[in-house]
Regions:
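N-terminal low-complexity or simple alpha-helical regulatory segments
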Residues: 4-160, 179
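Alpha-helical bundle regulatory/interaction domains
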Residues: 129-238
Length: 238
């Protein structure tokens, strides 16, 4: 059983205060391929988690950060926001430097589980997974201004559609695959391993063999679909 600690509550309250101030105060500008402070932005925590995965994969991080324009102070600023569309260059550079055509999958596989934040608290303080999911979707802007995750029942099966309001990012292969697996790992964490993924849909076309996708997701993975979507048993909702 996961326990809600005092430190977790304090971090969650801090995150909520940050969200509440979004429309009233300027957000600290980080020079990471920035095109202006009004653009859509992601939580800097996402890049910080990806950094941990890059360390595990022993990638050339100084070269990656230099080519992406990432400033070192970003790794220590939990309140930083990075330009959402910078993901396009970020994933291009990661694939180029690593030589890994499935770098999105492998980054997600090595990333620490997203925890100690308000979204985790919303799940752990809810009576059911379904309630926690509904509550957390209302706060997805904490992760990204562009997040468009939605819950839907399809033929008796629970699903989560994952998308972005950015036309440049919403069908980005590495990003879609990394976000999908990041969600699966997070859901497994908050349910003590009871979350069972049935299948995954992606809008992009498969490049190469699907064996690595099946290994990592542990289920059927279909490409060239109408949307990016996770399918799972509805039993976990109650």
């Amino acid at each position: 059983m996961l326990v809600i600690s005092v430190s977790m509550v304090n971090e969650c309250l801090q995150s909520l205060l940050v969200l509440a101030r979004f429309n009233s105060y300027p957000i600290k500008k980080i020079e990471f391929m920035s095109g202006g402070i009004a653009e859509l932005r992601d939580s800097g925590v996402l890049l910080q988690l990806a950094y941990q995965a890059m360390l595990e994969l022993e990638l050339n991080i100084p070269l990656i950060f230099e080519r992406c324009g990432v400033q070192p102070e970003l790794l220590n600023d939990r309140n930083a926001r990075t330009p959402h569309n910078a993901q396009v260059l970020f994933w291009q550079v990661l694939e180029d430097v690593s030589g890994d055509c499935n770098i999105g999958l492998h980054i997600a596989e090595k990333m620490p589980v997203y925890k100690g934040q308000v979204l985790q608290y919303l799940f752990l303080s809810s009576p059911t997974f379904g309630d926690g999911l509904t509550r957390s979707l209302n706060y997805q802007r904490l992760l990204s201004d562009a997040a468009l995750a939605t819950f839907e029942m399809i033929n008796g099966e629970a699903t989560i559609k994952v998308s972005s309001s950015s036309e440049k990012v919403k069908d980005l292969r590495h990003s879609s695959e990394a976000v999908a697996f990041g969600l699966v790992r997070f859901f497994n964490y908050v349910t003590d391993g009871r979350f069972n993924l049935n299948k995954v849909h992606f809008t992009h076309v498969l490049e190469g063999c699907a064996a690595e996708h099946v290994r990592i997701y542990g289920c059927d993975v279909l490409f060239g679909q109408a949307d990016n979507r996770l399918f799972f048993s509805a039993d976990i909702l109650n």
